[in-house]
Structure formats: C-alpha cells, structure tokens
Amino acid sequence: MLQVHRTGLGRLGVSLSKGLHHKAVLAVRREDVNAWERRAPLAPKHIKGITNLGYKVLIQPSNRRAIHDKDYVKAGGILQEDISEACLILGVKRPPEEKLMSRKTYAFFSHTIKAQEANMGLLDEILKQEIRLIDYEKMVDHRGVRVVAFGQWAGVAGMINILHGMGLRLLALGHHTPFMHIGMAHNYRNSSQAVQAVRDAGYEISLGLMPKSIGPLTFVFTGTGNVSKGAQAIFNELPCEYVEPHELKEVSQTGDLRKVYGTVLSRHHHLVRKTDAVYDPAEYDKHPERYISRFNTDIAPYTTCLINGIYWEQNTPRLLTRQDAQSLLAPGKFSPAGVEGCPALPHKLVAICDISADTGGSIEFMTECTTIEHPFCMYDADQHIIHDSVEGSGILMCSIDNLPAQLPIEATECFGDMLYPYVEEMILSDATQPLESQNFSPVVRDAVITSNGTLPDKYKYIQTLRESRERAQSLSMGTRRKVLVLGSGYISEPVLEYLSRDGNIEITVGSDMKNQIEQLGKKYNINPVSMDICKQEEKLGFLVAKQDLVISLLPYVLHPLVAKACITNKVNMVTASYITPALKELEKSVEDAGITIIGELGLDPGLDHMLAMETIDKAKEVGATIESYISYCGGLPAPEHSNNPLRYKFSWSPVGVLMNVMQSATYLLDGKVVNVAGGISFLDAVTSMDFFPGLNLEGYPNRDSTKYAEIYGISSAHTLLRGTLRYKGYMKALNGFVKLGLINREALPAFRPEANPLTWKQLLCDLVGISPSSEHDVLKEAVLKKLGGDNTQLEAAEWLGLLGDEQVPQAESILDALSKHLVMKLSYGPEEKDMIVMRDSFGIRHPSGHLEHKTIDLVAYGDINGFSAMAKTVGLPTAMAAKMLLDGEIGAKGLMGPFSKEIYGPILERIKAEGIIYTTQSTIKP
C-alpha cells in the first residue's frame, strides 16, 4: 500500500499575545502562471487551525484550485480578491511580476537560488519592491534536509506517468502489455485509484501475460530521497523484486517474466575515481571532477526504464551523455529472438522518467521539459533530435517539471502538513523591519532569500553566480566562431543563409568574383575578401589560420590546395565535391594534424551516400544483406522549362556535364562487370527509366560504380550501378556533339587570342571538312552526313545556332567555347525553376530468406526568385555538416565522407525541415 509521510496538526510553534492577532493577516494567493497548477500551499484543515488561533486568513478565489473555495470558507477563510491587507502571502509557484505587492512577505518556490536566468527578472522586481521572500526550497533542518517539499508526490506521479508511457511505447513497438490500462496520474481522483490500476496491471504480469519476446523488465531508481521513495511506492504495487546493481545484468537476461525487477542506485554503485576506479565519498563531495560514472556501461545496458531523481551540478559526472545514448540504442546483444508479430525490442533501454526535470543535467540529452499536456517525447540518438511521438526510433522521455500538480489534493494536504508548524512565525514577519529584528527559527530565517531590498549574506552568492554567467555569455559572444567560405557561386547562398541563422558565427567569404561577393555582402552579414587562391596561397594560409572551419565550394581540383592550408593550420574543412585521388593522398597528413575533413556532402555525391548508408546500416542491424543497389540522380529543368533540344538547362559551367559523355563507366550487373567506353558508343548504355513515367526520363552509368562495394560495405551485392538522369533526347543530342567533334578539349590555332574572330558556321565547316565560304545548305548537308543522317541531331545543332553566323566565344578549346555558348542559350531565366530527381533501389535479403525490394525517391523543386533545387540540395547538407562540426556533434577525425551514422543521421533528419523530403516504399517477396 502507498505510504505517505504526514505530520500531525498540533498547536503552532510560537506563542503570541492575543493583541497581535488582529494585525497578522495571512493570504493564500491563487496560482495563475500554469493552467495545470491546481495545488495550494495549505489545505482547509490547516486554515481551520490558523483561524482557530485568531488569525485572519484571506483566500483569493480560484476555480482552478482542486480544493473548492467553499471548503476554505467553511474552515474559516475569507474569500476575496483583494489580498493587500495580508502581511504574509503564500503560494506554490511564482506570481506574475506585475502582481507583486511591495513590502510584503511572500513564500513560494522562486527557482532563483541557482541564479536561474529565467527568474532573474522576478528576483530584480522582488528586490526593487523590498519584498521579503521565503523560499520553500531552502527550508531545511540542522542536517540540511528539506522540511517542506512536494518531492514524494513528484515521484508518485512520475512513476504512474512512465508506466502509462511504457504501455504506449511498447504498443508502438508491437506489444500489448498490462501497462496499457494505467492512465496518466491526473486521470485519477487520488493516488488510491491509481494504485488500484497499477495493482491490476501487476496481477496480469503475475499471470505471465507479458510478451516473452521483450524479455524481463528492469527499473532503475537513482537517488534515495523523497522523489525516489515516492516512485518506489508505486513500483512496489507491482509484483517486483529488488536486486543489487551488479545483479541487474543477469536478471535482465534470464529473469522471471511474471515479475519486474528494481534497482536503487546510490553514488557508490557507479562513481569511480579516474585514476584508480575507487569511490571516496568525502573526496567526491569536494572534488567531483576527479570522478567518472560507469552508469553507461555497468547499469544502463541492462535497464528497461530509468527513473531519475538526482540533480546535476557543474563538474559532476553525468549519468548519460549523447554518445552513451547512441551506443545504448544499438540492437541489444542479449535481446530474446523475435519473429514477425512477436518482435524483440530494438534495444533494452525503452524509457526514461527524469523527475528531476533538470534540463541538460545528469541526462545530457534531456534538453527540454515535457508538459502535462504533452507528457512524452522520443529522443533519437542517431539523429540527435527530439520528436513528439511514441513511435519511431529512440528512447521515450518524460520530464514534466510540475508533477505534483497531477495529484493536487493529496499534494496540497501533504505539503501543508509540513509547512503548518512554521506558518505562525511566518505570519509575524514584518517586511518593513530589518530581518535581524524578526523572531524566526533557523528553518525560516535561513530560507529568507531577499529582505529590505537586498540579498542576505547567505544568498549574496546568487548575484556572484549571475554576474559570472553574464560574463561567460559576454565572453562567448565575444569569441564568435569563425567560418571561411571559399567560393561565391550559386551554391554559396544556401550555405550562408543556413549559417547566418546562428548569430554566434562570423562568416568570411573568399572569392575572385568581386561582383558576386559584393552582392552576397548586401544580403548576408559577411566579411567579403577578394582573392585568387591559386595566385595568393600565402593569403589563403593567413585567412585559414584565423578560422574554426573552412567550407570549400570551389572546383574540386582546388580542394587539395585548400586542404593543405587547413592541415598546416589545424583547421577543420568540409566540401560538397568528390574526394579525389589528389585529396586522398593527404589522408595521413589530415590524421597527423588531428583535424576533420569531410567531403562528398552535396547531392550526388552526398545525399545519395547518406540515403544508401542509412538503408544499408538498418539492413545489417537485422542481419539482412544487400544483393543489389542501383542509384540514379539528376538535376533537371522543371518539365515546363525543358522545351529545347537538350531538354536541359545549365546553372553552372557545362564543361563537367559535357565531359561526362566522354568518360568511361564501370558497373556490376548480375555478378558481371560491365565496362562502357566514353564517346560515341556511350549512347548504347542509355536506358529508359520506367519510374515517374510522366517525366519521360533516361539514365546512363556514371564513373566506376564497383568501388562502392567496399565503400558501402556491401560486397554481397551482385548488382551495383550509380547513374545520371536526364529527359529523353538529351543523350542523343550530346551524341551529335561528339560526332561533330565539339566535345574536344584540345587547343586549336584558330582559338588563339591573336587569331581572327570565328563564327560557328566557319568552325562547323572546318569540322566537317568543307570550305568556310560554303552555302548554308551545303553545310547543312555535310553536317547531316557527319551525323549519320540523324535529322534530330541536326535540328538540335541548328536550334542552338551552331550552323549560323554567331561568333564563337573566345576560349582555349572547342569544348570551352561550346560551354560558354550553351550558358548563353540554355541558362535559367528569372521565372524558371529546376528540379532534382533521385531514385535509389535496393534488393535486401532477410535472414528469413525473403527478398525486400526497397526504393527511395527524392524530388525537389527550385523556388522562383529563390534558391534552386540544386543549390538547396548541395548547399544545405554541406552547411549542416559544417554546423555539426562547429557544435561538436561530429567527433571523428581524419578524411572521410558522410558514411557514418554520426554524420548522415542528423543531416537526413534536418533536411526535412528545409523542405527536402524523401519517401520510401518496400515490397517483400518470398
């Protein structure tokens, strides 16, 4: 049975002359800050005791208060709005600053004793109005133990809530349990009703009705105070057995499913000195920084539900960090085997009830309290995000900071029992007189936080703490993190926009395009620096040395130059481009410098890697193997803007795009290596795409796909292909350019600066071997012959003006000239937008023998007069990785791509908030 400590009502502790009674007035103010705050500091029985002694008690009316106003009136209280007559005003939580009355004595939980920033405005107002504040939290006995607290009821309500939450979470994981019939604490009229629901659930557990595949449930209680005792009082109503922490591992694996197991954790169970793994309580109290917690390795892996009731102080070890959570969410080594319909738990740790509600405290990743309205959230350690659901990956979290308000009547009565013996001396407080003149007991006197417009000596440390924090914040703002962005092309804008959201990041943009950086400087708060890194390596090194991070958005051939500067100055770096062999050669130097360089963070390469690795890692977690992987990606004009012979438009230099058709490609198909030569024969490798039929797509293989068997860790795959998507007709048009000799990077005499200007007609005449003075029809016939009689390719050349008298742009080669020409002809207009299409296909063989065909589709559109789809999908993931490095979310060192969960997990989640959405679909065949 739930046992709650109560103090009997006796005569108040201070004897007064009756002549003073009429002057001393007590008021109980209504709670008006939180909608769920239905408690009061005193119950009617306490009011009756006070009024019987001749004191006047005012009760501010409140329909929200759980105990009815009429019960207070019946006990002798006077119901009225105006409480200005009172010399002592009691509440539970803080009043609004505008409702404070000067030179009164107030008693409530102020939450100011740690110089909490959120309540410093309240403290200032209290000091200004010369209010005497008695803080319940500091009412302690000679041992330092609190004599007035709601702690036990926080434990009771918190335990009821987390049992309810576990019922919901386990159901989301595929398991009906007896916990489903336990409601939230506030759904019960009193704790006795809640206890009966817990007992009913316990009876079903004792009958063996818990799912076998989830294994024995273990509950760990931290601390031995009132909070822990209250939680244990509810837990004890289940068929439970308490074990020592060192026994937890065994019972979590082989325990009896007809009971649940509990462990009460004290400091000596998990704290050890860093040097010799010994715990010395006296030393720990003085030097907690010398100790570490082994909770993450010795206790947490065998814990189903953690009930945390301890607060965290600076320099003390945390129970769990973000990194701990990531390892704990890995599939359990000792989980019972599951089958379809009766799955095993994805990991042992299912839920945490952080009754301390200490954000960023002993549970580092509990960064935000939940509420009674929204009591649960899920912490996904892989993604390092919190989402409001009981579904998906992660740990169920409950961290309500006003739990006793869920059982307001009993909490009020119990709290009032503890406060009652001190009320009379508090009523006698005269806030207009010096504190030293008051006849207070040590319990009350030492709880006075403010008096006569000052902080008593005991609490002057609050101002010191406050000033220290403000100095730290000022220093933090003064030491802004510095980022150098190299390159000012269209990809740079989403990067700058994303990083600029953090006002503590100082951004420098280096580029040889002076006009571009000037335009960027008008839109974003940046430091523009005009420079050509190829010619100003010394300036590059000087700039890099002053940064915390470098983002290179330059052509890939320049990345090694930037990387060398980063290595020399030990500065981290990210880039969206491929990790080239030249960059790979610097791998050892990167490791020796102890820095992080992450490449391939854009779209392709980038998001394609991340989506692939997420699927592959999840498959491996369940023991499945990848049999096939095919990925196609393309940047295209939106369909309505594709009306040209190439069905394509350019947002940057076409050189790379045009050269792709001249590059060979290698891929694996059904266990056989297929080699595709570049040039004219490349057209034979083009395949019609049957997904998204409305887009009329074609695809062709890209570079060497076979190397990804090792990179992705999928040597089991018999098919590996990465390719490029275009609208149908694109490759045929480019094939015509190849036939005509336009995809040629060789320098020609006719392109020298001293040569006479050349028209496209003259150039084509030369390429097809006829006189430059030939008539148009003669040229047309010769070109058609060169194209093998393909009229479609001829029409494309004519549409682009390649048979006309337009002057060829000055360039080093025909390819460079063609690129400049295509930019003029096929650039995006101001009202035109692009799109990104990506399709990943996987063949996944499960341990059961079933073959899963899984597809991932990512389609994104550019914004008219905004960022293009290409800029967003390349720039944002790059910026996110940069921010993660700055924030310490990525701990790995060396040269790497986004192949680890530490990198791809958060990025894949965060791109959704930016409107980059991907969808998945699976079909399973026997």
From Swiss-Prot:
Pathway: Amino-acid degradation; L-lysine degradation via saccharopine pathway; glutaryl-CoA from L-lysine: step 1/6; Amino-acid degradation; L-lysine degradation via saccharopine pathway; glutaryl-CoA from L-lysine: step 2/6. Pfam families: AlaDh_PNT_N, Sacchrp_dh_C, Sacchrp_dh_NADP. Its EC number is 1.5.1.8, 1.5.1.9. NAD(+) binds at residues 488, 512, 516, 533, 554, 576-577, 603-605. It catalyses: L-saccharopine + NADP(+) + H2O = L-lysine + 2-oxoglutarate + NADPH + H(+); L-saccharopine + NAD(+) + H2O = (S)-2-amino-6-oxohexanoate + L-glutamate + NADH + H(+). The keyword NADP applies. The modification N6-succinyllysine is found at residues 93, 138, 274, 286, 333, 458, 523, 535, 584, 732, 761. GO terms for biological process: L-lysine catabolic process to acetyl-CoA via saccharopine; lysine biosynthetic process via aminoadipic acid; lysine catabolic process; negative regulation of transcription by RNA polymerase II. L-saccharopine binds at residues 577-578, 604, 703, 724-726. GO terms for cellular component: cytoplasm; cytosol; intracellular membrane-bounded organelle; mitochondrial matrix; mitochondrion; nucleus. It is found in: Mitochondrion. Induction: Induced by starvation. It is an enzyme of class 1 (oxidoreductase). Bifunctional enzyme that catalyzes the first two steps in lysine degradation. PANTHER family: ALPHA-AMINOADIPIC SEMIALDEHYDE SYNTHASE, MITOCHONDRIAL (PTHR11133:SF22), SACCHAROPINE DEHYDROGENASE (PTHR11133). Homotetramer. This is Alpha-aminoadipic semialdehyde synthase, mitochondrial.
